Amino acid sequence: MKTSFFSLGASTVTTKNVGRITQIIGPVLDAAFLPGQMPNIYNAIIVKGQNPAGQEINVTCEVQQLLGDNRVRAVAMSATDGLTRGMEVFDTGAPLSVPVGEVTLGRIFNVLGEPVDELGPVNATITSVIHRSAPAFTQLDTKLSIFETGIKVVDLLAPYRRGGKIGLFGGAGVGKTVLIMELINNIAKAHGGVSVFGGVGERTREGNDLYMEMKESKVINEENLSESKVALVYGQMNEPPGARMRVGLTALTMAEYFRDVNKQDVLLFIDNIFRFVQAGSEVSALLGRMPSAVGYQPTLGTEMGGLQERITSTKEGSITSIQAVYVPADDLTDPAPATTFAHLDATTVLSRGLAAKGIYPAVDPLDSTSTMLQPWIVGAEHYETAQGVKKTLQRYKELQDIIAILGLDELSEDDRLTVARARKIERFLSQPFFVAEVFTGSPGKYVSLAETIKGFQMILSGELDHLPEQAFYLVGNIDEATAKAATIQVESA
């Protein structure tokens, strides 16, 4: 680990290199400096002064281009309202730095690492620059290992890779937020890890809702912030493209500290990775670069790779990333999602149909995929159980049209048995969540992978054919299902 990435003490602004604004085009501005005092690419420069109304101005920008004639072009991280030509610009001499460490837990930050939750300043003793290189090959952990989440449907059918990247697909209201909060809760309890949530181009309302729900479910503990399990970094939809383009790096930098220094397993959520690309496209156009395919920036692959390659497992710890992916116009060949897919190890697809049936988490067992589901990685027992579950559910899906038209009685004996087992499997894939206890009234359940495999093997083998299907709904392991069946039998007697 390169300790030089992290610096003690809050970053201070140097004022030795002072320039003046020569041009402002929306969120992009040009500044002229004296010869020999030019800031470097990616340096943070700060515009200080007063607007015509006499209000103080403090706008941080990031240098993107050196134009010649001692001029630089920079992208603003906040609104440029009130800036005028001739205003002084101060070179900080370094890239943007943000606070890292335990002080970030339970707090909400903007792209600059400033708290925006009105809970007072952050006493950051350690800061880190947001532009860092990916870990060297010698530091990487090459072992393929599963990241156990305690969520049955994920661990069995689309397991996450430790240090991998997972795409989360789902529309509004199907349970993305609840699934995210349960993962944050489980990594803290089972792995002793923490989470960082990067809201990239989020709706402000959604960001606020997430924060309120996290407080309600005790993922964020307002009374004792040090007991919180997550740090939040928001760059909302209404902010300039520069802020939306860099907020993902701010969140990643905070996650890297927990991995490299605290040697923890970290979950990094990015919602939405498409907005990161979209912001980069806006900045690229403002900087005058020639657009590439479908109007995207020519540096799309480089920008995505720069972010994704930093998300990995090292010998010290891991960052496992779950990224919500918006697919524009449902076109999977669009350059933005297509570039994202190249980096993903697994996909978790949420289904509105399952949510409508009341099966939560509403993860689609047939559409969700994982590169980890190979017999030489997960073992023959896990692989064969998962394939058996998928085969049974696929057959049930094929028979649904016949059932709808002719009814169950017209099916063969074998098909009726398949349907009965598939309905049990479908219900057993549901699970009560810790963070949803306030809604369901049922205590949350963490189910180990071994218990998950055992349960589905028993359903597939026919051992539990005599149990009613409602016994499998919203339970943890298979023992709870058999106990629930006994209770149902007593109540109906």
From Swiss-Prot:
Keyword Ion transport annotated: yes
Binding residues for ATP: 170-177
GO cellular component, one term: chloroplast thylakoid membrane
Molecular function as annotated in GO: ATP binding; ATP hydrolysis activity; proton-transporting ATP synthase activity, rotational mechanism
Catalysed transformations (reactions): ATP + H2O + 4 H(+)(in) = ADP + phosphate + 5 H(+)(out)
Keyword terms of this UniProt record: ATP synthesis, ATP-binding, CF(1), Chloroplast, Hydrogen ion transport, Ion transport, Membrane, Nucleotide-binding, Plastid, Thylakoid, Translocase, Transport
Xref: PROSITE patterns: ATPASE_ALPHA_BETA (PS00152)
HAMAP family: ATP_synth_beta_bact
Name recorded for this polypeptide: ATP synthase subunit beta, chloroplastic
Protein's gene: atpB
